[in-house]
From Swiss-Prot:
EC number: 1.2.1.38
Keyword Transit peptide: yes
A UniProt-annotated Pfam family: Semialdhyde_dhC_1
Quaternary structure and interacting proteins, as annotated: Homotetramer.
Source organism of the structure: Arabidopsis thaliana (Mouse-ear cress)
Gene3D superfamilies linked: Dihydrodipicolinate Reductase, domain 2, NAD(P)-binding Rossmann-like Domain
UniProt KW keywords: Amino-acid biosynthesis, Arginine biosynthesis, Chloroplast, NADP, Oxidoreductase, Plastid, Transit peptide
Catalytic reaction annotation: N-acetyl-L-glutamate 5-semialdehyde + phosphate + NADP(+) = N-acetyl-L-glutamyl 5-phosphate + NADPH + H(+)
Catalytic center residues: 205
Transit peptide: 1-48
Keyword Oxidoreductase: yes
GO process annotations (BP): L-arginine biosynthetic process
Protein name: Probable N-acetyl-gamma-glutamyl-phosphate reductase, chloroplastic
Pathway stated in the Swiss-Prot or TrEMBL entry: Amino-acid biosynthesis; L-arginine biosynthesis; N(2)-acetyl-L-ornithine from L-glutamate: step 3/4
Amino acid sequence: MSTASAFSSIQGCWFKGERKIRVADKRAKRLTLGSHVASPSSMSFRVSASSSVKPEKDIRIGLLGASGYTGAEIVRLLANHPHFQVTLMTADRKAGQSMESVFPHLRAQKLPTLVSVKDADFSTVDAVFCCLPHGTTQEIIKELPTALKIVDLSADFRLRNIAEYEEWYGQPHKAVELQKEVVYGLTEILREDIKKARLVANPGCYPTTIQLPLVPLLKANLIKHENIIIDAKSGVSGAGRGAKEANLYSEIAEGISSYGVTRHRHVPEIEQGLSDVAQSKVTVSFTPHLMPMIRGMQSTIYVEMAPGVRTEDLHQQLKTSYEDEEFVKVLDEGVVPRTHNVRGSNYCHMSVFPDRIPGRAIIISVIDNLVKGASGQALQNLNIMLGYPETTGLLHQPLFP
């Protein structure tokens, strides 16, 4: 099923009063509380015995791009997963090194030696997390065995419109034939389609904070499709681990800076998802800002309510829509979400406030950009794809202070 039809199918299976109650899923949740890459044409996809780890769990996991922040975060989360074990890790520039030499905080885990993609043997894994930068993922995924379940954390498969991808990302798409089978991985919204997917495009961090609150409100026709303004802020880890002058401590500390003004690459992804559920074109004004903090993301969203709708109605719709969801928490009226309260976790906190301008409302949504905004949601999706309760390995409480 395409993402467009998947979003349309929300009408019959997601919101209370209209959705089919997923008894098994609800029970499962309760029971679980416990770079530069080598060209595929040169790839032989092999790995030496010294680079592998004998699996001790049910599912063997391959991790592409393990030396970045999202790769390291997946390894951290999998440490407490009872069924998934990392048996293959690639990092072209770090090939031959141990993971603990790249990320000393992972020293206690039994992990394979890093290898280059061209030396990886994907017959030794059952599923793959792809944490490579956009533009490097397409050709690699195209060459992987079709039996593998894949969650791609890059932007390469998020946009259905190939021309739109090429316009916003400034490069040709090299795996167009795969796009038709991709399922967009906004877990709480497209869970049923994710269950049947082979290849999931994990959402971007900003689109996650924005779509989670807006999708139920647009679906219920409580807000207008026009004049949506989004002021978003992210910690520096969202820019990746690569050395950049703009991300040096002396450049970031004690200041705030806007970036991607009018042309941030997450805009078409946001508009695609909102337009799908609204069944008409939705446009947004979106400006992100870089904050002097490591983790965390907040989206402050200004919306115009439909005639006769009150902020209490928006709040109640969100409460009803997410009452059975483990990882989305709608706070009590008047309680302001804080990034500190979701740090290191897969939770999203949100709330609604009245604007002083009549007819408008303010929605605040916060996540940890590396967890719910990336690696945590990716693990949530793979759990679903492989038939495990989606909370497995993810019930870490937020870090505080």
